[in-house]
Regions:
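Active-site-proximal, well-structured secondary-structure segments within enzyme catalytic domains
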Residues: 1-25, 36, 73, 79-228
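A conserved non-catalytic segment of reverse transcriptases
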Residues: 27-29
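C-terminal catalytic core of Y-nucleophile DNA break-rejoin enzymes
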Residues: 31-33
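Short, charge-rich amphipathic alpha-helices with coiled-coil/heptad character
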Residues: 37-54
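Generic structural signal for well-ordered, non-membrane alpha-helices
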Residues: 45, 72-75
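Short hydrophobic/aromatic-rich motifs at helix boundaries and adjacent loops
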Residues: 45-49, 58, 95, 146-149
Length: 228
């Protein structure tokens, strides 16, 4: 694993009272580098399956009952408001307008993406065979062998590239683009309550200097925080 990934796992372990060990969680910034770089295929399989099955294990964190209740309540809500289903209710205010338009778009993407995905799978299987693997490509192999293939074909290493994109500079770049395209400006605010000490707040103004809103920058995953 890259040194940065190992250091992050050590920090997570320390935060959980396991100093001297390494902890990988099911949050994307932790699991995705593991799937991308870890040589141990059995561990990749374990963490991938844990990620896919999260919230559906036979324990106190099983969400099946909660999800069933949410789906039922959403159907009731949609029908009370005069819609045949929840998708129609949600899409009524969106550009797509209805489920049929969404399915048409998804199908167009699917038709274009599927042949490319199959070609990528064939290339990854060749890489597995070439490096002595005696198994068929599985979901937990995809990122790992895609990384190897990328290095072989293009000489690219994401870990080496990432050092040229520190968070602050990436944020400045995003603000610069927003200003050039839309005239937006961002001014950091130090007098607002924040959800976490690492979070930042920025006032957003339009090209005329008119207040538009507040942008909260809270980039890092942590326990209890929703992703996305």
């Amino acid at each position: 694993l890259p040194q940065g990934v190992i250091a992050a796992a050590a920090e997570t372990a320390k935060e959980n009272g396991l100093e001297g060990k390494w902890v990988f969680t099911l949050q994307n910034p932790s699991i995705m580098p593991f799937l991308q770089y870890a040589d141990n295929r059995n561990l990749r399989e374990q963490i991938y399956k844990a990620y896919i099955d999260r919230g559906s294990q036979d324990n106190a964190y099983n969400n099946w009952a909660n999800i069933s209740k949410m789906v039922s309540l959403r159907v009731q809500k949609a029908r009370l408001l005069g819609f045949p289903d929840y998708a129609s209710y949600v899409l009524d205010d969106n550009m797509a307008k209805n489920s049929e338009n969404v399915y048409q778009l998804c199908n167009r993407i699917w038709e274009a993406a599927l042949p490319i995905s199959r070609q990528e799978a064939r290339e990854l299987q060749k890489m597995i065979d070439k490096t002595g693997g005696r198994f068929k490509l599985a979901p937990w192999d995809w990122r790992y062998y895609a990384e190897k293939l990328k290095k072989e074909k293009y000489g690219l290493n994401e870990t080496e590239i990432s050092q040229y994109f520190p968070l602050e500079e990436v944020r400045k770049g995003a603000f610069y683009v927003a200003n050039k395209l839309y005239g937006l400006t961002f001014e950091q605010l130090d007098n607002l309550p924040l959800p976490h000490p690492e979070a930042l707040a920025f006032e957003v103004k339009d090209a005329d200097g008119k207040h538009i809103g507040i942008y909260y920058a809270d980039y890092f995953p942590r326990a209890g925080k929703s992703s996305g």
